[in-house]
Amino acid sequence: MRYACIQRHRGEFEVLLMCRVLEVTRSGFYAWLKSVPSAWARTEERLRVEVRAVYEMSRGRYGSPRVHAELQARGERVGRKRVARLMSQEGLRGKKRRRFKVTTNSSHTYPVAPNVLDRKFDVDEAGVPDQVWAADITYVPTREGWLYLAIVLDLASRLVVGWSMGETLESSLAIDALNMAIQRRRPAAGLLHHSDRGVQYASNDYRALLEGKQAVVSMSRKGNCWDNAVAESFFATVEIELIQDEDWHTRNEARGAIFEFVEVWYNRQRRHSSLKYQTPAEFDKRLWEAARAPLPKAA
């Protein structure tokens, strides 16, 4: 198109001269120029599409920091403030965290361990996986009744290495999650295992399993949920990004959704703020590569 040719070369030749050569009017060229979206406007529109695609990929869970991180991971050069502005203009808002609820019962006669972990939660990029695990239990409402979820989380990468679901809060629920973690990760002796003082974690069977793996047992102080803040934070994420928007009729419906959330979304796709917006699986892989050790293989 002649107008487009003039636009491409207007820095080299006078507009009037090019209009005469191409037999178009100067007023016609400038009218065309006003009707053509600027490069900035075209970029804005493309970014709007990309931002919405990432937001929808997250099922409406991501706020602007994680949308920005995902766009950068895809090779998009864009500032966080621009992403936040575009999301605001499009009415896209991430889900906000609510206060979490205590589920385990610490009223029992089993012995409890001291708080060895002592809130040392910081992620160390030079660290080694499977040095510290945190365990906890939450409950999930369905129309059929409660479904309970127990998890074991690796503190180095925030990866959920073991989990179990059941209809009761018996010790076997926590034991099944721990067994999964052990089979998947094969931790070395000296693993530090932290939990609250719930009866499931203080029980003889659970403690025997830890002792058999030569693990060091650590427990939160009585009534202090902040001593197990990483596990509590994971459950707050589950609640805000999954549970609060669902109305499951059966426990089996909830089981399927929770499995997908933990294994597919949280471990492998969700970008974690404390991991510099990498996924737990990505961060875990980097830690193993830095340690020059093979990734653990399940039995």
Question: Predicted regions span which residues?
Answer:
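Charged DNA-binding/catalytic regions of mobile-element recombinases
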Residues: 1-299
